Amino acid sequence: MPTPNAPNPVSNPKARANLLQVISERSLLRDTEVMLASGASSTFYFDMKRTAFHAEGASLIAQLILDQLADLDVDYVGGLEMGAVPLVACVIQRSFPDRPLGGFFVRKQPKDHGTRRLIEGLRQEESLAGKTVVLLEDVTTTGGSVLKAVAAVREEGASVPCVITVVDRLEGAADNLKKESVELRSVLTVHDFVL
């Protein structure tokens, strides 16, 4: 049985409640059979792009992720394309000017044109070597997708102490990440929602 991953305490429970409402109204699809990235099927699905590309949703996500980062000394936030891209953008924007963070995203595979880089968003001379990175995810199930990003970032010489997800489906990600010495923090879990 997977280890339960309770949401970490946040400084603004009202923002958390508001985000729960926005996700419930915009992103939670019920009574539909979907295939998850993990390969499992589910009768509910979080289409988080509908929240991440919504003004209030993006603002709340950024605020609550920054709350989760408060106790960490972090240089960059990043994540795997596509789900993490809007999260990284809203978090780094909101981090300025108080605690400016760098940001990037990890491609699933390099393009065959352009810079052909696996990690995008860094200047040519910029490196993750020796940096501390927290990876972001919109929804986490088993952690398989974000572990690919962890491996890519570690290959560049960065440390990844933590992954922060907006919604943890509580299907084993915390245990799988722990095996790689990565803590999983969540803003919300599946138990917060009426399914």
Regions inferred by a protein language model and the residue ranges of each:
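PRPP-associated nucleotide enzymes
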Residues: 1-136, 140-195
